[in-house]
């Protein structure tokens, strides 16, 4: 089981002492405070390389950027001020008025959990550093997807796929899976509808914002399947599946299964396994129906007339994935995902609350029901919306999820030391290692970087771009000895270009 995967999370942000504060400003303060605490001067801060970005290229074969007029002029100084690349290979920046942490590329879902969790520690530290700045208002950051006022912000997943797989097969095979997986991956939400005005509890924070089956947009008319075709790799060989339907998860089992099961279902699709019998009659409607039924008993209509629950759909995918994995050479990583997936589905079938120590939405629902019973509250009570928000607070001593972990009421898959190491260090088995180590060792000599290149400024007449189009190259095994053998960026570039 080896697929390049990673997460990118826009964090909710607020300034309790100044509710009217501009979120772009406060998000910028968070990023800059983290950079300052890391001792990175603005003049030496590595910028993001936008030259290779193509967010309007569509996997269905067209490019909206060609018909939208000349590209906007980006002020590198203005953007770069709140845009940094970390020594762990991640990107920390301001996106749509939110601080965003884009994790480095991983090959294993458990590693992806570690570097995703590292983002929570980065954001917690950023808010703490802002509070230490004289005159700056305190900030609170939340790993969630809704602001309670009708807006949603993203927690996206990325999966590298073979370009040879027709995108139509991706849409057909993945749609029923994405619709049904929220029984495992939902983070839970108080309120129904985009603004949360209707009282109740639902599985997913993202479900009410899904409007179409397939689409390019990520901020409006959001699709179950996103069609952005921006591989950040060799475009002749790869496509990057950009998933926007998912929730921001804190529970490590939720994150692990979100990434691991999706990766294995993509194996099915790439192998050409026929999944057409799982087509849904009304996929967008099914997203909403499943999210709004915490009992997990609601059924959705398939195109062939059958009615199945989300758990039943997940079991069909599980069985087909297990059959594929059994036909291959032994793969302990894939087997562990399958075992965990099967166990979670069994628990959910028996009683969803049996997953309250491992999945987000049951954990949150258990907390909320406790408040409701103790204080005789209805789902309309504002207090419950506050509990919902506090669950996602990234502060280790205040966030309700983190407090559950501290008292042993939430099970972890990884150790805190692994997470803290990942805050500083990149994964060793992808190009993120080369990017992160270059930043650590030669940061002052790097002008810019992106997922697929590192650009050096060695004082000559021109910059030197080192492409990293193969995500599995640039690993420690590939370049570790080279990096250890050179004393300067000049030597490194000479070795690489010669």
From Swiss-Prot:
InterPro entries the UniProt entry points to: Pup_deamidase, Pup_ligase/deamidase
Keywords: ATP-binding, Hydrolase, Magnesium, Metal-binding, Nucleotide-binding
Gene that produces this protein: dop
Family: Belongs to the Pup ligase/Pup deamidase family. Pup deamidase subfamily.
Cofactor note: ATP is required for the deamidation reaction but is not hydrolyzed during this reaction.
Residues binding Mg(2+) 1, per UniProt: 8, 93, 100
GO biological process entries: modification-dependent protein catabolic process; proteasomal protein catabolic process; protein pupylation
Protein name (record): Pup deamidase/depupylase
Null mutant phenotype: Pupylation is severely impaired and the steady-state levels of the two known proteasomal substrates FabD and PanB are drastically increased.
Function summary: Specifically catalyzes the deamidation of the C-terminal glutamine of the prokaryotic ubiquitin-like protein Pup to glutamate, thereby rendering Pup competent for conjugation. Probably also displays depupylase (DPUP) activity, removing conjugated Pup from target proteins; thus may be involved in the recycling of Pup and may function similarly to deubiquitinases (DUBs) in eukaryotes to prevent or promote proteasomal degradation of certain proteins.
Keyword Amino-acid biosynthesis: no
Note: Is the only enzyme acting as a deamidase of Pup during pupylation.
Binding, Mg(2+) 2: 8, 156, 242
Cofactors: ATP
Documented EC number(s): 3.4.-.-, 3.5.1.119
